[in-house]
Amino acid sequence: HPETTFATLCTPFSFPKLRTKAKFCAIPSTSGTATEVTAFSVITDYAKGIKYPLADFEITPDIAIVDPALVATLPVKQVAYTGMDALTHAIEAYVSTLNSPFTDPLAIKAIEMVFDYLPASYDMDMDAREQMHYAQCLAGQAFSNALLGIVHSMAHKTGAAFSTGHIPHGCANAIYLPYVIKYNSHEPEAMRRYADIARRVGLGGTSEKSQVNALIEKIESFNRYMNIPKTRKEFGVNE
């Protein structure tokens, strides 16, 4: 489609009809983005400091090969960042206003798996890396239908916006996620669903508020364990 412009592609769901001659097979090499099962992609213009999200079901792969052998040697920093990206996908899908009985089981199972396996995956446990590879795929199927929230909105807007350099997407998500949970939990339905997540992963608390706080504290503990900065300033952004 040589007649198609990039500006057109940046308009959601405006892609021309694709794959009339060939099928699209996607094979993920990290355990986080779940691009192999979603209708979303991102192109970053570092010169302009802009990340362009692309959204169209025409870019959803026809076939996904989720092979955990491909992440056996993934560096631990990428394990941390992509793992927190997967967790953010699942949590935002579960709390999304577009959640449904079809997306909830995928999202909550992905959350449980990330809580169970991400620290061990970071520590080079191969069984845990396999499970994380599956978890991120489940999270992708959830958010591709329920969509995401302001964690991702901010991560996309700020990922390439600063002169001090690019903030990796998963790192930005990990930084923002605890703050967004705290902010969103002022809305009763969001608090209820965050508290439900906390209960499902075995966190304590005698009220929904205390359960949400326990969830925030657990996510922050993951970040500390995997050496993820708490703020943009800690990452190195000085503006």
Each predicted region: which residue ranges?
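Glycine/threonine-rich beta-strand-loop-alpha-helix active-site module
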Residues: 1-69
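Gly/Pro-rich interdomain helix-loop hinge
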Residues: 161-164, 170-238
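Glycine-rich phosphate/pyrophosphate-binding beta-alpha loops
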Residues: 32-33, 138-173
